[in-house]
Amino acid sequence: MQLYLVLLLISYLLTPIGASILGRCTVAKMLYDGGLNYFEGYSLENWVCLAYFESKFNPSAVYEDPQDGSTGFGLFQIRDNEWCGHGKNLCSVSCTALLNPNLKDTIQCAKKIVKGKHGMGAWPIWSKNCQLSDVLDRWLDGCDL
């Protein structure tokens, strides 16, 4: 029990100040305002679905992929080995900039990624959870854009 409390306290202390999960409609509005609705032919619903399955709408999310050793950053879990930081840095952005809750750098980098030959298929989680979904409309239910 003591170990559990210590681990809980440590995880609380390591949570970045100001880190918060964004609401679904907040994410939709920010992505819409950032010009992602039908960008390269992909509806806003696809982008919101991707954001949910990649980060659960957490713009501060950082997850390491144990399979390839890369780390994903931010709302869309953009990988450091190719798109940001010290890797190929095809987005010309620091990985930590992708953790900003204003999503400006995240949206600009996502636009570069989706312009590539794979489109949104560059995110395998989108292909698995969003691409063939017949309920994409639900991602914008009740959102005032």
Swiss-Prot record:
It comes from the Eukaryota. One of its GO terms (biological process) is single fertilization. Keywords: Cell projection, Cilium, Cytoplasmic vesicle, Disulfide bond, Fertilization, Flagellum, Secreted, Signal. Residues 1-19 form the signal peptide. It holds the Pfam family Lys. It is found in: Secreted; Cytoplasmic vesicle, Secretory vesicle, Acrosome; Cell projection, Cilium, Flagellum. GO terms for molecular function: lysozyme activity. One of its GO terms (cellular component) is acrosomal vesicle. Residues 20-145 form the C-type lysozyme domain. PANTHER family: LYSOZYME C (PTHR11407), LYSOZYME-LIKE PROTEIN 4 (PTHR11407:SF21). May be involved in fertilization. Has no detectable bacteriolytic in vitro. Has no lysozyme activity in vitro. Monomer. This is Lysozyme-like protein 4.
